[in-house]
């Protein structure tokens, strides 16, 4: 296959695709809006699942490198009631199928595996159009354009490539996440650190739509995800530019919860960050459009739970393998890839039930059922 694959988006999915293509001798160019690899924080920890993310890393021939960035002990898990009572606890004995790593380390690992110059930084896409000859032109904010024989949109929730294939747009799910960080937690936030434990902590009560979850990340950092089912105008009324005001307003929704849980909000060392959760229509499909396809959130954005990144990596790996297997028939490769992706993303996964357990009507019992099922299977 002599065609250079044009990839928009240097996230985990787009970079996995570029890596698998590179292994098979297929050139690619990745265009990324960010100015550099260090332009912004790449998010927190990510558990790489043995049934999708790890399969992608195996296809990318990066499992050894991945093992080198795994955070030991972070598969430990506990579920707490609102009074701080531990309802379920599982230690990390090294046998779990979801090792944790920092998203930034994963991205750096993928970048280091590509030829120098593969990623073109500082290329924010403003639009894309189909040319008369069937190829696609991508326009960038810096005034330049590129014409692609084969274009892949790996550009996330608000993809500029998606309109070439479908008019679907993300809609607010009704749920938002408020992120907080507590640094040097063992020293400065000892009670909270003890409550969270060595890995992940899920705090849930009987009220649907409220949860305080946290992970222990590198450097004794606690990264909390406070989940609230509220309309967007509720969050619009919160002044997130004033850290103390925002912390107090969000914490007020958890009246009656144990102070060591609400401290994940009130003791945050940064201003809380509001992240509304958007999703594309469930079961989204489109008719084949020659020379272009999507992967990851650009194709099947769902509620943020870690599964999306794993699926994006698997999409990238599967697309790369499909193109390598049919170098003389790109359209057949794209059609087969899309069909498999559609089916894969329509299949209910454990994380779907996990979200329902957090925001459904029978919390925290549903959540405990999932954790206990996981423990039996392991």
Question: In which residue ranges do the predicted regions lie?
Answer:
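Conserved N-terminal helical subregion
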Residues: 2-5, 20-22, 47-186, 233-236, ...
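Conserved catalytic-core motifs of eukaryotic protein kinase domains, centered on the activation segment
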Residues: 41, 163-164, 305
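Short helix-loop capping/hinge motifs at secondary-structure junctions, enriched
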Residues: 64, 185-192, 260, 326
């Amino acid at each position: 296959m002599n065609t250079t694959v044009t990839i928009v988006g240097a996230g985990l999915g787009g970079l996995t695709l570029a890596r698998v293509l590179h292994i098979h001798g297929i050139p690619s160019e990745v265009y990324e809006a960010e100015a550099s690899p260090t332009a912004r924080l790449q998010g927190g920890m990510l558990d790489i699942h043995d049934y999708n993310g790890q399969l992608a890393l195996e296809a990318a021939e990066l499992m050894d490198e991945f093992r080198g960035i795994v955070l030991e002990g972070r598969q430990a898990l506990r579920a707490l009631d609102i009074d701080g009572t531990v309802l379920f606890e599982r230690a990390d004995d090294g046998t779990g199928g979801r090792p944790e790593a920092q998203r930034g380390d994963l991205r750096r690992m993928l970048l280091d595996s590509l030829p120098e110059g593969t990623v073109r930084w500082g290329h924010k896409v403003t639009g894309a159009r189909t040319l008369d000859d069937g190829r696609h032109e991508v326009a960038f904010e810096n005034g330049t354009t590129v014409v692609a024989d084969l274009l892949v949109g790996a550009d996330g929730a608000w993809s500029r490539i998606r309109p070439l294939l479908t008019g679907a747009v993300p809609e607010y799910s009704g749920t938002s996440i408020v992120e907080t960080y507590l640094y040097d937690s063992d020293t400065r936030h000892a009670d909270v650190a003890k409550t969270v434990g060595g890995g992940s902590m899920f705090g849930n009560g009987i009220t649907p739509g409220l949860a305080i979850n946290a992970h222990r990340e590198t450097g004794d950092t606690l990264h909390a995800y406070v989940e609230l089912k509220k309309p967007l105008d509720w969050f619009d009324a919160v002044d997130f530019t004033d850290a103390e005001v925002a912390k107090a307003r969000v914490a007020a929704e958890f009246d009656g919860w144990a102070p060591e849980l609400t401290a994940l909000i009130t003791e945050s060392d940064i201003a809380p960050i509001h992240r509304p959760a958007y999703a594309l229509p469930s079961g989204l499909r489109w008719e084949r459009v020659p020379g272009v396809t999507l992967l990851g959130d650009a194709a099947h954005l769902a509620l943020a739970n870690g599964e999306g990144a794993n699926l994006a990596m698997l999409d990238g790996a599967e697309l790369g393998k499909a193109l390598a297997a049919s170098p003389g028939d790109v359209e057949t490769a794209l059609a087969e890839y899309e069909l498999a992706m559609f089916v894969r993303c329509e299949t209910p996964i454990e994380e779907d039930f996990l979200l329902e357990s957090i925001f459904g009507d029978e919390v925290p019992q549903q959540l405990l059922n999932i954790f206990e099922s996981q423990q039996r299977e392991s």
